[in-house]
């Protein structure tokens, strides 16, 4: 998808003709809005000169709402009604939210978890919309007019549910979404245009609540994401939790009041940020029961606490490189994104892995918003000379559908460039079949039971035909936002059915890691299972077709032949339930051998019937 606007050489839109579009980084910890002004992307500040808007919303009695820094100051005093890190709950179920250990009262509801506040039960979409509305108003105040749209960034590992939740939040905030853009890709836009760099680059994005690693190939203005990885529940918040656990050793933190837990996390974050520039930092919190928790955290102690968390990010980086078929030495540079990458321990270990000093030319808090602003400006039609780059994102997990025997037919493999459309033809299994069930799945395994179910729908109105005669074309389409739609069409009649995939909740980080790891560790067993299922399906098809043939033309066999076929038919029917692939294959072959002459006689009868009463010249 070339993101180009054609104009006469040297032309540029007049100021009054420019369409106002912004890039928004909807972050876990902080959110920002940026725009291109005088051909330069810049982050927009509020009336107090602050560019970072804390992603915090406090709900008060009477309907009042506090957003940003004001809400953040009250989180320790009113933790249940002050929602922070809401991005972690986008598209999630109540079970996922509770497992995160966040100090809120979660309510299970259809589609997505809700958070209980004094203003009722609110969805993460509604909370995020409050943050987006503030950013929209800030942009309109600074730019002096209404916006035509926004590009909003999301982690590359966000699945369909999380992306759709982000779109819904923007719509609630009165924003027209021009595109959802993967955060690492946004960073690549900012760095690529500034540095005019080419080669293989890694984008290491460690934010407040999510981690993404993307491997990109930059060639002559083309940004191609060739592999992605990450963890949707790993970020700066987890480093804060590690500090709390260390400072409160021997204390059952989970049993403390919510206000105390929130105060501990606030103190931990302050200590973590102080250690960026200092050798040690104080950790002091007075609990509601009067007890004081005091500690001094050194940088060495923090690095020890952080090591397993940083190690998880490096494991993801190694997996992404393997997916791309690259070695560490192939990477020309590493772009650092996200406020958590300011931690010296992160920069040191990332540099050690890749053997190069990470790139930190641009503010890691702002780089994603700047890249999104450039993309938004382009999509709005405000193209300037030289802005002729192309974005190629990828999907993180394979997409396919269920076939006979519970097998997965992979339609779009993981790491395929998006937007993408792939189609494949299927047929009916039984004579006279007039409907087909389409089961869409996501994952890397060969069996449907080992993959994630995304959607089901039925195609009805298939003309009755013999098994295998109908042609049903199934098309998978993934748009530039990573959202999937599936269409099934019967070719002769044009009858069609479709579904837009919006799963009720997203994958947890553990599920994502398991799906990718299992595809490697279970490869041999999956191959054996596929072979067995395929043989079982073949046995079932042969048993059904032979049974139908005997019912129609059984008189073509003499008693001895019929007895042999019946015996082989029964053996093949019983073999369908066996777990021995060779035994099933042998039973199928035996039945095929026993019915070979029978099939020839049926063919002769069919030909004679077709020729009966016809003259030779009619066949010429």
Curated annotation (Swiss-Prot):
GO terms for biological process: iron-sulfur cluster assembly. Keywords: ATP-binding, Chaperone, Nucleotide-binding. This is Chaperone protein HscA homolog. Belongs to the heat shock protein 70 family. NCBIfam families: HscA, PRK05183.1. It comes from Bordetella bronchiseptica (strain ATCC BAA-588 / NCTC 13252 / RB50) (Alcaligenes bronchisepticus). The keyword Nucleotide-binding applies. One of its GO terms (molecular function) is ATP binding. The keyword Chaperone applies. Chaperone involved in the maturation of iron-sulfur cluster-containing proteins. Has a low intrinsic ATPase activity which is markedly stimulated by HscB. It comes from the Bacteria. SUPFAM superfamilies: Actin-like ATPase domain, Heat shock protein 70kD (HSP70), C-terminal subdomain, Heat shock protein 70kD (HSP70), peptide-binding domain.
């Amino acid at each position: 998808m070339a993101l180009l606007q054609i104009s006469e050489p040297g032309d540029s839109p007049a100021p009054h003709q420019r369409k106002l579009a912004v890039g928004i980084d909807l972050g876990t910890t902080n959110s920002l809005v940026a725009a291109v002004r005088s051909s330069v992307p810049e982050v927009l500040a509020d009336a107090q000169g602050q560019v970072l808007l804390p992603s915090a919303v406090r709900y008060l009695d009477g309907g009042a709402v506090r957003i940003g820094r004001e809400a953040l100051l009250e989180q320790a005093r009113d933790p249940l009604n002050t929602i922070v890190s809401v991005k972690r709950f986008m598209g999630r179920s109540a079970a996922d939210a509770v497992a995160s250990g966040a100090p809120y009262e979660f309510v299970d509801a259809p589609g997505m978890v809700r958070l209980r506040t004094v203003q009722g039960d609110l969805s993460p979409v509604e909370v995020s919309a409050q943050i987006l509305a503030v950013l929209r108003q800030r942009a309109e105040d600074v730019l002096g007019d209404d916006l035509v749209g926004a590009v909003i960034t999301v982690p590359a590992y966000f699945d369909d549910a999380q992306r759709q939740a982000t779109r819904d939040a923007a719509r609630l905030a009165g924003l027209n979404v021009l595109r959802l853009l993967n955060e690492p890709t946004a960073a690549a836009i900012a760095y690529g245009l500034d540095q005019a760099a080419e080669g293989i680059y890694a984008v290491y994005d460690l934010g407040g609540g999510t981690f993404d690693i993307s491997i990109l190939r930059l060639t002559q203005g083309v940004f191609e994401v060739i592999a992605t990885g990450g963890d949707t529940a790993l970020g700066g918040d987890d480093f804060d939790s590690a500090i709390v656990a260390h400072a409160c050793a021997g204390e059952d933190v989970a049993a403390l009041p919510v206000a105390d837990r929130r105060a501990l996390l606030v103190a931990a974050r302050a200590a973590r940020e102080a250690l960026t520039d200092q050798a040690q930092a104080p950790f002091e919190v007075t609990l509601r029961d009067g007890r004081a928790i005091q500690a001094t955290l050194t940088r060495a102690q923090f690095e020890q606490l952080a090591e397993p968390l940083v190690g998880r990010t490096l494991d993801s980086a190694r997996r992404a490189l393997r997916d791309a078929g690259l070695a560490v030495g192939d990477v020309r540079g590493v772009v650092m994104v996200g406020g958590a990458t300011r931690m010296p321990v992160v920069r040191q270990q990332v540099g050690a892995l890749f053997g190069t000093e990470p790139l930190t030319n641009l503010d890691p808090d702002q780089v994603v918003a700047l890249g999104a602003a450039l993309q938004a400006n382009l999509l709005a039609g405000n193209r300037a000379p030289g802005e002729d780059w192309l974005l190629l994102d990828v999907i993180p997990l394979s997409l396919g559908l269920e076939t006979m025997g519970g097998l997965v037919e992979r339609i779009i493999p993981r790491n395929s460039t998006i937007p993408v459309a792939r189609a494949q033809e299927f047929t009916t299994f039984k004579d006279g079949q007039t409907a087909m069930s389409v089961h869409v799945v996501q994952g890397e395994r060969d069996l449907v039971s080992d993959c994630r179910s995304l959607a089901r729908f039925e195609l009805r109105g298939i003309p009755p035909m013999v098994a295998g005669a109908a042609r049903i074309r199934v098309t998978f389409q993934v748009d530039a936002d990573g959202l999937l739609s599936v269409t099934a069409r019967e070719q002769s009649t044009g009858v069609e059915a479709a579904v837009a995939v919006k799963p009720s909740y997203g994958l947890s980080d553990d599920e994502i890691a398991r799906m990718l790891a299992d595809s490697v560790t279970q490869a041999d067993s999956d191959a054996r299972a596929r072979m067995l299922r395929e043989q079982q399906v073949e046995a079932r098809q042969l048993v059904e077709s032979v049974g139908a043939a005997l019912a129609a033309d059984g008189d073509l066999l003499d008693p001895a032949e019929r007895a042999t076929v019946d015996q082989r038919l029964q053996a093949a029917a019983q073999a369908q339930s066996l777990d021995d692939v060779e035994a099933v294959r042998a039973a199928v072959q035996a039945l095929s051998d026993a019915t070979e002459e029978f099939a020839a006689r049926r063919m002769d009868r069919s030909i004679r019937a077709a020729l009966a009463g016809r003259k030779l010249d009619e066949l010429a």
